Amino acid sequence: MMIRIGFGYDVHPLVEGRKLIIGGVEIPFTKGLLGHSDADVLYHAIADAFLGSLALGDIGQLFPDNDERYRGIDSGLLLQEVYRRVRERGYCLNNLDAVIVAQKPKLLPFIQKMRENLAVLLNTAIENISVKATTTEGLGFAGREEGIAAYAVITVKEVLENG
């Protein structure tokens, strides 16, 4: 059985007048993430990790920010399309480990719901999904509350025809 690894990263600036959506969860906060879609930084990092695992490019190539079809789109739909392409090539998720980097808001109360959302979107057991959050101890753009970043590492495994 072939196992492949993918790594993804995404970042979006925090701005007033936008909803903060991370991992498909709307989080009460005074600012939201700016982007062409709903700017779900976690879903974007995971999508890039999936694409990287099979050398399929990145989400910017697949869903360009100058394409009006994707303006304001739910990033869960983008992630589902990416995962459909992974499955189409004979692979499925083995394990996902992600970390969100944000000084504020505190994300711990929302992590379990993010994991549940991902388990449903990716049709896998929640035990295969790890999501964590951390701060930068006040350092850098995240520490200054200018933006939020996410990193994701995944392994995908080849789906065997008879087993």
Swiss-Prot record:
One of its GO terms (biological process) is terpenoid biosynthetic process. It comes from the Bacteria. InterPro entries: MECDP_synthase, MECDP_synthase_CS, MECDP_synthase_sf. Its cofactor is a divalent metal cation. Binds 1 divalent metal cation per subunit. It catalyses: 4-CDP-2-C-methyl-D-erythritol 2-phosphate = 2-C-methyl-D-erythritol 2,4-cyclic diphosphate + CMP. Gene3D superfamilies: 2-C-methyl-D-erythritol 2,4-cyclodiphosphate synthase. It holds the Pfam family YgbB. GO terms for molecular function: 2-C-methyl-D-erythritol 2,4-cyclodiphosphate synthase activity; metal ion binding. Keywords: Isoprene biosynthesis, Lyase, Metal-binding. 4-CDP-2-C-methyl-D-erythritol 2-phosphate binds at residues 10-12, 36-37, 58-60, 63-67, 134-137, 141, 144. Pathway: Isoprenoid biosynthesis; isopentenyl diphosphate biosynthesis via DXP pathway; isopentenyl diphosphate from 1-deoxy-D-xylulose 5-phosphate: step 4/6. The record marks H36, T135 as: Transition state stabilizer. PROSITE patterns: ISPF (PS01350). Involved in the biosynthesis of isopentenyl diphosphate (IPP) and dimethylallyl diphosphate (DMAPP), two major building blocks of isoprenoid compounds. Catalyzes the conversion of 4-diphosphocytidyl-2-C-methyl-D-erythritol 2-phosphate (CDP-ME2P) to 2-C-methyl-D-erythritol 2,4-cyclodiphosphate (ME-CPP) with a corresponding release of cytidine 5-monophosphate (CMP). NCBIfam families: ispF. Belongs to the IspF family. Homotrimer. This is 2-C-methyl-D-erythritol 2,4-cyclodiphosphate synthase.
